[in-house]
Amino acid sequence: MAASRRLMKELEEIRKCGMKNFRNIQVDEANLLTWQGLIVPDNPPYDKGAFRIEINFPAEYPFKPPKITFKTKIYHPNIDEKGQVCLPVISAENWKPATKTDQVIQSLIALVNDPQPEHPLRADLAEEYSKDRKKFCKNAEEFTKKYGEKRPVD
């Protein structure tokens, strides 16, 4: 299966290079189509926790994009209550087979670090982010402390 070969290669590259913002990567070698790991954001209000994500690759990968789901709750305008994320790089209309998983993860980390209220999945949080940033940051920080996972120690 071409998807498995490519994913094995991408996983090796990611593990070899070591992404400081994507840690504790877990992959069942028998099923390379599902990855889990921790997103470790740099910027407040998310820098006090880590967020578990799951990446599901279709059997048609790389010709179809992966889907990303947050398993850890996060207070973010671009991520809904079910953990679905609005990430342009993996939308069907923008996806390119040459895009690698590490690029997708970098885009996701950039989005978590810097919310895009103009493309919200949660309009209420986008409005709060745009109109009262201080309140948004306070709420997001409290939410992160309550639900976020422990950050890995180097």
Curated annotation (Swiss-Prot):
Changing residue 100 to E: Decrease in autoubiquitination. The active site is at 86 (glycyl thioester intermediate). Changing residue 119 to D: Does not convert into a lysine reactive E2. It is found in: Nucleus; Cytoplasm. Pathway: Protein modification; protein ubiquitination. InterPro entries: Ub_conjugating_enzyme, UBQ-conjugat_E2_core, UBQ-conjugating_AS, UBQ-conjugating_enzyme/RWD. The keyword Amino-acid biosynthesis does not apply. Keywords: Acetylation, ATP-binding, Cytoplasm, Nucleotide-binding, Nucleus, Transcription, Transcription regulation, Transferase, Ubl conjugation, Ubl conjugation pathway. Ubiquitous, with highest expression in testis. It catalyses: S-ubiquitinyl-[E1 ubiquitin-activating enzyme]-L-cysteine + [E2 ubiquitin-conjugating enzyme]-L-cysteine = [E1 ubiquitin-activating enzyme]-L-cysteine + S-ubiquitinyl-[E2 ubiquitin-conjugating enzyme]-L-cysteine. Ubiquitin-conjugating enzyme E2 that specifically acts with HECT-type and RBR family E3 ubiquitin-protein ligases. Does not function with most RING-containing E3 ubiquitin-protein ligases because it lacks intrinsic E3-independent reactivity with lysine; in contrast, it has activity with the RBR family E3 enzymes, such as PRKN, RNF31 and ARIH1, that function like RING-HECT hybrids. Accepts ubiquitin from the E1 complex and catalyzes its covalent attachment to other proteins. Mediates ubiquitination by the CUL9-RBX1 complex. In vitro catalyzes 'Lys-11'-linked polyubiquitination. In contrast to other ubiquitin-conjugating enzymes E2, residues essential for lysine reactivity are absent: Pro and a His residues are present instead of an Asp and an Asp residues in positions 88 and 119, respectively. This is Ubiquitin-conjugating enzyme E2 L3. The gene is UBE2L3.
